[in-house]
Every structure is written in C-alpha cells, then in structure tokens.
C-alpha cells in the first residue's frame, strides 16, 4: 500500500517538473518571437512614412475647434467649404468657368478640388426665406446696401446663431418673451406682424384685443422678421399666417461654422439686439472692393485665417431645420 502511495507522489512530482519545463520553453520561444518582431519594426521604422491620426486636444470640454493633422500641411483636407454670393457677382464676372478658376486658386491654399462649393442667391430677401448651410464651413457674402441694412442685420443674426424654436398657435394662446435670448422668428413670402401687449387682466395696453387695427405693427411685408417685445408681458399677436410662419425661439449661442463677409459699406453691421452691449462683430467681416474678382481673390488669400476663427460643426441649417436645433 505504501509503495503505491509513494509511486503516486513521485509521478505527480515528475509531471509537475515536466509541465514547468514546457511552460519555460514556450515562454522562451514567445520572447524570441516578440523581440525579433520588435527588432524588425525598429529597423524598418525610419524607412516607412505613415499617417499619424493622433490629435492633441486641450482639456476644454469642447471638440468644436479644428486641429491640424500632425503629418500633413493641408489643414482642411477632409473639410468642405460653401461660399454663398449674390447672383450679380456671376453676372459681372461673365465667365462660365470662373468657379473652376477659383477652385484651382483655393487648391493653392490647401483646399482640394471638389471641397469648395459655390452657391448663388438672388437677393438678401430670398436668401432669408431659404438659407441652406450644409458645409463644414460656410461663408456668406452680402453686398452692402444702405436700404437693406436691417434686413442684412436680421439675416446675419439668424445664420450666425443657433436657435431652438417651437410652433406658436396665435389663435388660441397669448405669448410672452422671457428674456433677451427669447425672440419670435417669422419666415415667408410676406410677413406682417402686429402685437398687442396685455395687462394682468388680459386687457390691451394701448390697444384693443378685439380690433387688430389697433395693434402695433412690428414687421411689415418682410420675408424674415425677428421680433423682440417687452419681456415678461403677455402679447396677443396677429400674423399673416397664409404667407408666413412664426416660431417662438430661444438663442442658444453662436453657430460657429458660419461667417458673414460684408462687401462694401462704411462699417460692419451690428447685429446685437441689446443696446447696452458692445457691437457683435465676431465672424462678421468686411471687404471693400468694387469688382467681384477682387473680392474673391481676397477671400482666397485669407480663407484659412477666416476659417481659423470658426469651428467645424456637423449641424446644418435650412429653411425647415432652422426652427429646431439640428
């Protein structure tokens, strides 16, 4: 009996030694393979040009700022740029291939062919009804017109900021604005907005709620109207709903992938609604040239500096989506 027990113990010890030997052999073989593989990589590394996709981001809580790829000089290699211009520019240039010429010039600034899109619009009013800002970066050219300063200012306020909007049922409800960021935005072929402020008894202040002719006109036959009234006061509204849509909107902050370039004019338009603050000129720029070729040449020269004050975003803006944050 004791002989059998000794034999069992001896067999177990021999097996343990054998397994330990196998494990050490496998470990030495793996070490040999790994070290040989690393040696090959080290020897070949100087001769291989690879793409480094690493990005050093500052800890700011924001991913909106564009950063240059560490192994390429084309900062905006994978970005798209939309350039919006009045149709009169194309009419003056009178060259069917002028956009191709500009595309080649943008290529010299690091923008590959096909990454820059040119979109014309008839006038400020028509562009206000259907703004379409789909590119990573959007630059809107507005030719200064002294008679359209307010229209230009409202359009700039719309496209340079993000708005969270909800429908308004003016036939059933009264509405009030809560703070300076709260505005009523109307869009359509013809928007006439009338308001009647109400007291705590819902009686009109300086107007009669049953007589729309006594309401105050705050917008008349406009295609885009941003209405600001006294905060904290209920209002009854009258809107030309057959040709216009009105929304209750809250300004969330800047739409940082859009810039407006004013062509001509003595000063950059101020789109700040609050009269006690300094004029808002961020991403509002001005170019003073008489000829459109000179305007576009200047934009090509400064395109990368212009884009540096913007931030690449994935959200787009169009005539329907502007009502909601997209």
UniProtKB/Swiss-Prot annotation:
Glycosylation sites: 69
Location(s), subcellular: Virion; Host endoplasmic reticulum lumen
Cystine connections: 82-135, 165-249, 191-244, 196-207
Post-translational modification: N-glycosylated.
Keywords for the protein's UniProt record, in alphabetical order: Calcium, Capsid protein, Disulfide bond, Glycoprotein, Host endoplasmic reticulum, Host-virus interaction, Metal-binding, Outer capsid protein, Signal, T=13 icosahedral capsid protein, Virion
A GO CC term assigned to this protein in UniProt: T=13 icosahedral viral capsid
Signal sequence range: 1-50
Positions of region (CNP motif): 165-167
Chief subcellular location: virion
General function of this protein: Calcium-binding protein that interacts with rotavirus cell receptors once the initial attachment by VP4 has been achieved. Rotavirus attachment and entry into the host cell probably involves multiple sequential contacts between the outer capsid proteins VP4 and VP7, and the cell receptors. Following entry into the host cell, low intracellular or intravesicular Ca(2+) concentration probably causes the calcium-stabilized VP7 trimers to dissociate from the virion. This step is probably necessary for the membrane-disrupting entry step and the release of VP4, which is locked onto the virion by VP7.
Additional free-text comment from the UniProt record: Some rotavirus strains are neuraminidase-sensitive and require sialic acid to attach to the cell surface. Some rotavirus strains are integrin-dependent. Some rotavirus strains depend on ganglioside for their entry into the host cell. Hsp70 also seems to be involved in the entry of some strains.
Protein name as it appears in the record: Outer capsid glycoprotein VP7
Organism whose genome encodes this protein: Rotavirus A (isolate RVA/Pig/Venezuela/A46/1985/G5P13[13]) (RV-A)
Biological classification of the source: Viruses, Riboviria, Orthornavirae, Duplornaviricota, Resentoviricetes
